[in-house]
Amino acid sequence: MAFEDRCSPSQANSPGPVTGRVPAPHAETLAYSPQSQYTCTTIESKYERGSPNMTIVKVQPDSPPPSPGRGQNEMEYQDYYRPETPDVKPHFSREEQRFELDRSRGQRLQPTTPVAFSINNILHPEFGLNAIRKTSKIEGPKPIGPNHSILYKPYDLSKPDLSKYGFDYLKSKETSDCNALPPLGGLRETVSQIGERLSRDREPPKSLEQQKRPDSASSIVSSTSSGAVSTCGSSDASSIQSQSNPGQLWPAWVYCTRYSDRPSSGPRSRRVKKKAAPEEKRPRTAFSGAQLARLKHEFAENRYLTERRRQSLAAELGLAEAQIKIWFQNKRAKIKKASGQRNPLALQLMAQGLYNHSTVTESDDEEEINVT
């Protein structure tokens, strides 16, 4: 490996064209030759990537070139900067250029400010304790009336202030409190029942005077909260009623659970019955004189018609068989009503209790009731 030492002032060649502001040397006044600030190194071809004879010019900027009057004229060299020298850059492949570009973009887009909720903050054991401390300082509602002490009660007065304890202690205490109760009461109690039982265990025994007050707010709240459990039907309400105090009154809606098993159907609505249209009366048949005379003659001979006789009479008079049949029935009813005599067979059946077709008529003029 061949090195060319060009650092000595006597052997160094001129560094080439120099651009930039460099103070002119004092060639005439003083015989002063400053030390060169460039080092040129020649590398063999086995270490090169690009051209076979590649020369890398390594610039080592030192302090500005000294001068005899440096101590006096130090302010003149404040604007001194390294002269611009054309450097030979090595050749990179496309993959390397792409990698360098992606790395520069990633460094440019990397956020400098820390994220408030990063993974490190979340995994920290103190994460979330500030929220607990803030919520523990929230004040309850202000007292409004004399029954404030009865209506309002904090969640748990027995628990001390949790802000002075560590995270491990709070976690162990939370697990112990959760293990004290079965999950949801072993699926046999509702949430309201569990809360009622816990409040009953923690509360001191009430005085007799407070128990005698029927209008106390505590009894109202307890009855309302316990009454909210009975929404599954009248059978559940009756079972709860038997388990609780016999003198306790339940709200009326507890017993009104007729449609609880099928809530989608809803209450049944009674349809309004439409008024039936009046039956169209059959138009009265207008018989001619000849037809009436022939019908009266046949009725005088025999009050009852056979089927063959009725058919022949209908064909002779040009009437329907039903018209002739109805005329004979009406004629017999008029005679029976006018005479007032009963058929002896009908009287015998009525005596045996097998026949009773007595009709009650009320006359408009005399308003008397006649039983026929």
UniProtKB/Swiss-Prot annotation:
It is found in: Nucleus. It comes from Bombyx mori. Signal peptide: none annotated. This protein might be involved in the compartmentalization of the silk gland. Its main location: nucleus. Residues 1-35, 47-112, 196-246, 261-286 are annotated as: Disordered. Residues 216-244 have a biased composition (Low complexity). One of its GO terms (cellular component) is nucleus. Keywords: Developmental protein, DNA-binding, Homeobox, Nucleus, Segmentation polarity protein. Transmembrane segments: none annotated. GO terms for biological process: neuron differentiation; segment polarity determination. The lineage of its organism: Eukaryota, Metazoa, Ecdysozoa, Arthropoda, Hexapoda. This is Segmentation polarity homeobox protein engrailed. Pfam families: Engrail_1_C_sig, Homeodomain. One of its GO terms (molecular function) is RNA polymerase II cis-regulatory region sequence-specific DNA binding.
